[in-house]
A protein has these predicted regions:
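Membrane-embedded catalytic cores of phosphoryl/pyrophosphoryl-handling enzymes
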Residues: 93-151
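Polar/charged alpha-helical tracts
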Residues: 8-9, 52, 71, 101, ...
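Secretory-pathway/luminal and periplasmic proteins that interact with or process carbohydrate-rich
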Residues: 75, 89, 149-151
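N-terminal transmembrane-helix/juxtamembrane module of multi-pass inner/ER membrane proteins
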Residues: 1-70, 77-94
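Solvent-exposed, acidic/flexible segments
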Residues: 66-69, 73, 117-121
Length: 151
């Protein structure tokens, strides 16, 4: 599905250097945020989040379509992550001698950028909107919740 996906434009995305004042500012802002220990786990399983939208509806959840999108987009996202090799905030915080609380999650073991959960949830939301356009608002909200749970 994504065999010929061109990642070149994603290589052009820039972010502050790991040891920059801007990165320090980002870490300090994260330090001020309370650590939410519920949302990251609630929204960790992307397929399940979208499947829940269908739990009270007559429409059937296209499980295979969603799983295929998630599985086949993973190598592309990992390729972009490995290209940028952006450390997770807790790793950068240590470089500034800042103790940053974070949740150790199995799904958070790759470089931080881009967020795989954000990318995949948006991809799933777009695909499901093509199938069920009348549920667009709910799909977009689910993708937004998934993205925000990764902060």
């Amino acid at each position: 599905m994504f065999d010929n996906f061109n990642i070149e434009k994603y290589k052009q995305i820039s972010f502050p250097k790991d040891n920059s004042l801007r990165t320090l500012g980002e870490i300090k802002r994260l330090k001020l945020m309370p650590l939410n220990k519920v949302l990251p786990f609630k929204y960790d399983d992307i397929g399940n989040v979208f499947q829940n939208i269908f739990s009270h509806r007559a429409e059937s959840f296209p499980y295979r379509v969603v799983q295929k999108l998630i599985e086949e987009s993973e190598p592309v996202i990992k390729k972009i992550k490995n290209y940028h090799n952006r450390p997770r905030p807790n790793v950068n915080a240590k470089k500034f001698k800042i103790d940053l609380d974070y949740l150790k999650m199995k799904s958070a073991q790759t470089p931080a950028f881009p967020s795989g959960h954000s990318a995949q949830s948006k991809l799933v939301a777009l695909a499901l909107t093509d199938i069920y356009p009348h549920l667009k608002r709910e799909f977009d909200k689910a993708a937004e919740n998934i993205s925000n749970s990764r902060i």
